[in-house]
């Protein structure tokens, strides 16, 4: 096994189901890669980022929708931090966070056509995930302290004063266009490359949760996380955000 491989084992071998015609079913030719909570997190984050972006242009002086989307993103980010500890095998940080050197080595192998497939995130993809999570975290934190100086303001803008809150608002906007959209574009380009050039159905896998049976570096099949634990993580995340804003912010 590759020295960068993770140590978890599959919960089972691919199910050998047969159709009436004797042919192996589609499910028998695939294995579990991503559990439901992880997939819901990803697509919910995409939807909320898009909502925050689009709603920033609404004729809404208080930016109600924009702020609601921002709170939702913050809840998801805290949830993902918890899920990265208590979630399914491919969602845990311990299984995909690697050093920049490991990511660079993987990219060299990829360029040479010698990179082996990963069931979860490969070393470069793992760093991209961390970059996106950190980038979104900075974006939301900037929004909490932002103010347009008129009607729209984050809940903590009063802590830093109008002048600083105005500067933060400018950074908040610039960060989105130069960092968030840049990372998102790189992420999309990488997904399209794997999907259509490497023939690795990673986009479909993030919808169905399953990948084709292959000799993956990081295990044959992923172990799904508990839905009950996912629910608890989400409630804790929502409670932290609501409590922080209610206790220390000017408004929810």
Description of each model-found segment:
Residues 1-252:
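Membrane-embedded alpha-helical bundles that constitute the cytochrome b-like, heme-associated redox core
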């Amino acid at each position: 096994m590759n020295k960068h491989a993770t140590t978890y084992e599959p919960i089972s071998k691919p199910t050998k189901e047969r159709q009436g015609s004797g042919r192996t079913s589609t499910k028998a030719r695939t294995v579990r890669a991503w559990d439901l909570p992880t997939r819901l997190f990803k697509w919910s984050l995409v939807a909320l980022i898009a909502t925050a972006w689009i709603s920033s242009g609404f004729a809404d002086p208080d930016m109600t929708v924009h702020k609601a989307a921002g709170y939702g993103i913050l809840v998801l980010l805290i949830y993902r931090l918890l899920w990265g500890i208590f979630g399914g095998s491919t969602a845990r940080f311990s299984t995909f966070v690697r050093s920049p050197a490991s990511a660079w080595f993987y990219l060299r192998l990829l360029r040479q056509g010698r990179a082996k497939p990963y069931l979860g995130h490969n070393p470069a993809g793992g760093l991209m995930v961390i970059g996106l999570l950190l980038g979104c975290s900075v974006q939301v934190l900037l929004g909490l302290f932002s103010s347009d100086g008129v009607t729209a303001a984050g809940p903590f803008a009063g802590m830093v004063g109008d002048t600083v809150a105005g500067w933060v608002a400018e950074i908040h906007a610039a960060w989105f266009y130069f960092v968030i959209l840049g990372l998102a574009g790189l992420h999309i380009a990488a997904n399209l490359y794997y999907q259509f050039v490497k023939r690795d159905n990673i986009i479909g896998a993030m919808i169905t949760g399953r990948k084709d049976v292959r000799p993956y570096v990081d295990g044959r099949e992923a172990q799904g996380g508990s839905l009950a634990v996912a629910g608890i993580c989400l409630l804790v995340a929502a409670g932290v955000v609501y409590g922080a804003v209610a206790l220390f912010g000017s408004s929810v």
